[in-house]
Amino acid sequence: MATKLFPKFSQGLAQDPTTRRIWYGLAMAHDFESHDGMTEENLYQKIFASHFGQLSIIFLWTSGNLFHVAWQGNFEQWVTDPVHIRPIAHAIWDPHFGQPAVEAFTRGGASGPVNISTSGVYQWWYTIGMRTNQDLYVGSVFLALVSAIFLFAGWLHLQPNFQPSLSWFKDAESRLNHHLSGLFGVSSLAWTGHLVHVAIPESRGQHVGWDNFLSVLPHPQGLTPFFTGNWAAYAQSPDTASHVFGTAQGSGQAILTFLGGFHPQTQSLWLTDMAHHHLAIAVIFIVAGHMYRTNFGIGHRMQAILEAHTPPSGSLGAGHKGLFDTVNNSLHFQLGLALASVGTITSLVAQHMYSLPPYAFQAIDFTTQAALYTHHQYIAGFIMCGAFAHGAIFFIRDYDPEQNKGNVLARMLDHKEALISHLSWVSLFLGFHTLGLYVHNDVMQAFGTPEKQILIEPVFAQWIQAAHGKALYGFDFLLSSKTSAAFANGQSLWLPGWLDAINNNQNSLFLTIGPGDFLVHHAIALGLHTTTLILVKGALDARGSKLMPDKKDFGYSFPCDGPGRGGTCDISAYDAFYLAVFWMLNTIGWVTFYWHWKHLTLWQGNVAQFDESSTYLMGWLRDYLWLNSSQLINGYNPFGMNSLSVWAWTFLFGHLIYATGFMFLISWRGYWQELIETLVWAHEKTPLANLVYWKDKPVALSIVQARLVGLAHFSVGYIFTYAAFLIASTSGRFG
């Protein structure tokens, strides 16, 4: 008999008489493949439609950012003095605020309590040519409309007449062409257009709006140089070093340049360099989007390319034969590849946003710099873990050994022991040596002989920095050698502003490094290799191992195969993912600690503190964590509170969430089941209370679910705690 209870997608679960029905229902809600009556075509259609919903939410969110700043922010005031006025994210209304809180949170020229923005949106909107609240409102309304259109498109593509067929989804060449040319190419071209027609004129004091954008020439010669082949004209007469951003003072006429370095006043990349970059990207991707064969019988076939990739030596076996269908028929493989790419790019964004700041005055807003770096590194960590999770699910659900016989994918599985043992060896080597050096240095500090520390100069990294033009180390090589051809061409032709930037101590480009950096670099390498070891092992052992050859029959997440097969606990692919997330968080902790402490000392003009204290563990604990948490733990005290009080409270709250995670991670299912049964007995025996009864018999979470709950609390608490520390210690110090 069919039941109407949740979950509709699984009759088996809907008929479960216990609370398993609810928790398993939530766990399986997005695992469309496992739903009753699911066909491959319907699976693709559902996922396709959900993408529109995702985009709709993103546009609504960005619309909300614009709307709240326009309504409650101080954008127009900030534009007049971006260096000294603090940007307001939105107003705060809280009935708990007393007079001291109202006063503490009333800042940035506001009339009541507000939140200060640390996301960089003010700097971004200013750089791309926005100047008034009206600009922000128009953008907000436009994005809200786009959001509504995407929501409608999602609904539309669920209707039978508008559902694409399976063959449409499997047409990889067409999809690649459209995504390369359309998504990346044309959007980059459009962005170049915006920079050239709106942002660059605004940066030179020439307002461009809907009223005049068709009549204002971005370059005095118009399109003549383009059609006559005299493209160099667009690079002539760039903005000068004395240019005041947003005014005509010191401005030039160039629109596409190759200057290198930073605008002296805003400390950000030259807008004309960025326009040039996006134009180049657009050309490359529009060309790339015409590579693959579709309707006209010209161009490459992906399958042919892959099957031709068989080295004549025979050392790769069947090479890439069979891979096209393997990838094209597995959504998990495709998602794994996409997540790995996006995760890598997100980490690169973190690295480049601070070292090469693209937005005007971003570099001097230290809290924003710290927040953006930390945010993007954490996001990258979670996405990368997801890539390996879906790689493992691919091996369990979608991998066909017959179809991949002897190819590179099968060979990865065939020599997995070598891969895993090498990763293990590297992790052990890095761990013991790095910890050994740190601990030795701690002992020397503790025993009063700091001169006996083992301090290793990172000579290879310094040599690489010197090759890129950093003169400090005296290597006299390539760009740091005045006699080399690289130096001569760099000064005249390629990025003439680069060498000034790399040798300027006021920015974050190629920071000076020493023994402390050498040690923390290897600590981070330990974290990266250990995380990779756990993730790679989880995916490569997902189908089976010597211990459990039939593992794939148990699915992605299983706790054990009962008491009969001792030692099968904790070896599911999900367990590997679960363990890897802890190591990922650990690693990103070290990465962000390093970045933040290095920059705090740089911004304070006190680099010696990092250089001297980062070579031993007590230095990190005492001079980074303890010293910088003083503002936090004084956000409120018996004598009153200040504007850091909300971060001080969040710091405590983050610790609470984090600690709650251990309650689920350390005690297993039996404890909770026993406790629940005792509570059920007490409930049934209590007068009045026993008049109220439940439809679903209460049972404990499964081991797998409890681990997820524990992991979620651990992760969220960990991140909240560090976010509060990061923002309070930076903003408390630099305002």
UniProtKB/Swiss-Prot annotation:
Record GO biological process: photosynthesis
Binding residue positions for phylloquinone: W672
Catalytic activity: reduced [plastocyanin] + hnu + oxidized [2Fe-2S]-[ferredoxin] = oxidized [plastocyanin] + reduced [2Fe-2S]-[ferredoxin]
Effect of R565E: Loss of PSI assembly and function
Residues annotated for [4Fe-4S] cluster binding in this entry: C560, C569
Binding, chlorophyll a B3: M663, Y671
Membrane topology, record value: Multi-pass membrane protein
Listed result of changing H655D: Very little PSI detected
Its EC number(s): 1.97.1.12
Binding residues for chlorophyll a B1: H655
Effect of H655 to C/G/N/S: Contains somewhat decreased amounts of PSI, depending on the strain; significantly changes the spin density of the P700+ cation radical
GO cellular component: chloroplast thylakoid membrane; photosystem I
Swiss-Prot/TrEMBL keywords: 4Fe-4S, Chlorophyll, Chloroplast, Chromophore, Electron transport, Iron, Iron-sulfur, Magnesium, Membrane, Metal-binding, Oxidoreductase, Photosynthesis, Photosystem I, Plastid, Thylakoid, Transmembrane, Transmembrane helix, Transport
Subcellular location as annotated: Plastid, Chloroplast thylakoid membrane
Highest taxon above the source species: Eukaryota
GO MF annotations in UniProt: 4 iron, 4 sulfur cluster binding; chlorophyll binding; electron transfer activity; magnesium ion binding; oxidoreductase activity
Transmembrane region(s): 47-70, 136-159, 176-200, 274-292, 331-354, 370-396, 418-440, 518-536, 576-597, 644-666, 708-728
Classification via Gene3D superfamilies: Photosystem I PsaA/PsaB
Pfam families in the cross-refs: PsaA_PsaB (PF00223)
Entry-linked PANTHER family: OUTER MEMBRANE PROTEIN, OMPA-RELATED (PTHR30128), PHOTOSYSTEM I P700 CHLOROPHYLL A APOPROTEIN A1-RELATED (PTHR30128:SF19)
Task performed by this protein: PsaA and PsaB bind P700, the primary electron donor of photosystem I (PSI), as well as the electron acceptors A0, A1 and FX. PSI is a plastocyanin/cytochrome c6-ferredoxin oxidoreductase, converting photonic excitation into a charge separation, which transfers an electron from the donor P700 chlorophyll pair to the spectroscopically characterized acceptors A0, A1, FX, FA and FB in turn. Oxidized P700 is reduced on the lumenal side of the thylakoid membrane by plastocyanin or cytochrome c6.
Complex and partners: The PsaA/B heterodimer binds the P700 chlorophyll special pair and subsequent electron acceptors. PSI consists of a core antenna complex that captures photons, and an electron transfer chain that converts photonic excitation into a charge separation. The eukaryotic PSI reaction center is composed of at least 11 subunits.
Protein name: Photosystem I P700 chlorophyll a apoprotein A2
Encoding gene (name): psaB
